[in-house]
């Protein structure tokens, strides 16, 4: 799903990569 993918990219720029890998993206 393209929207989810774009949202994921926006999240990873705001959050640390390690945090993203552990918890996933909840925006």
UniProtKB/Swiss-Prot annotation:
It is found in: Secreted. One of its GO terms (molecular function) is toxin activity. GO terms for biological process: arachidonate secretion; lipid catabolic process; phospholipid metabolic process. GO terms for cellular component: extracellular region. Its EC number is 3.1.1.4. SUPFAM superfamilies: Phospholipase A2, PLA2. It catalyses: a 1,2-diacyl-sn-glycero-3-phosphocholine + H2O = a 1-acyl-sn-glycero-3-phosphocholine + a fatty acid + H(+). The keyword Transmembrane does not apply. Its cofactor is Ca(2+). InterPro entries: PLipase_A2, PLipase_A2_dom_sf. Expressed by the venom gland. Keywords: Calcium, Hydrolase, Lipid degradation, Lipid metabolism, Neurotoxin, Presynaptic neurotoxin, Secreted, Toxin. Binds 1 Ca(2+) ion. Snake venom phospholipase A2 (PLA2) that inhibits neuromuscular transmission by blocking acetylcholine release from the nerve termini. PLA2 catalyzes the calcium-dependent hydrolysis of the 2-acyl groups in 3-sn-phosphoglycerides. Belongs to the phospholipase A2 family. Group I subfamily. This is Phospholipase A2 1. It comes from Micrurus nigrocinctus.
């Amino acid at each position: 799903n393209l929207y989810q993918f774009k949202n994921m990219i926006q999240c990873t720029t705001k959050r640390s990569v390690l945090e993203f890998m552990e918890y996933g993206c909840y925006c």
